[in-house]
């Protein structure tokens, strides 16, 4: 698939998500495509991930600021905006709606094969998102700091 075509597919992904057309979103990816949230390590199916964000931010919108394609890879610098009016899935457990507005820059790294997205990795500042939601940006239960080992104590 040509590089320009891959960039167009990713732009179409964001347009479909903005319309909350999850059938179209899913049609742009392979059936086994996975999304990895790099900050948390969470992995979901492609449609499941898109639906999770749409549930958490029903008025959400993605603005693709820069989309760069090279071979099978498309990197998209984006800004996501929306109101947290639904449950947000997180590795520490579900976060109930806060009613707070969020504006979050993020970067998506997509891999495509034969005109379909096969995997995506999303990079974003979880601390900024948690602060905008009015929640602690501290470590989650799975990331609790540990005491230094005896040889590292002063």
Description of each model-found segment:
Residues 1-154:
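C-terminal and inter-domain tail/linker signature
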């Amino acid at each position: 698939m040509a590089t320009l075509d891959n960039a167009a597919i990713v732009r179409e992904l964001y347009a479909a998500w903005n319309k909350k057309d999850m059938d179209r979103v899913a049609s742009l990816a392979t059936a086994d495509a996975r999304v990895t949230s790099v900050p948390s390590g969470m992995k979901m199916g492609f449609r499941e991930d898109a639906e999770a964000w749409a549930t958490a931010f029903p008025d959400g919108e993605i603005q693709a600021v820069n989309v760069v394609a090279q071979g099978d890879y498309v990197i998209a610098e984006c800004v996501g905006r929306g109101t947290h009016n639904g449950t947000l899935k997180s590795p520490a457990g579900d976060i109930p709606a806060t009613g707070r507005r969020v504006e979050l820059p993020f970067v998506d790294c997509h891999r495509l094969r034969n005109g379909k997205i096969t995997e995506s990795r999303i990079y974003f500042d979880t601390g900024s998102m948690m602060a905008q939601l009015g929640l602690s940006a501290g470590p989650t239960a799975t990331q609790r700091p540990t005491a230094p080992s005896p040889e590292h104590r002063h």
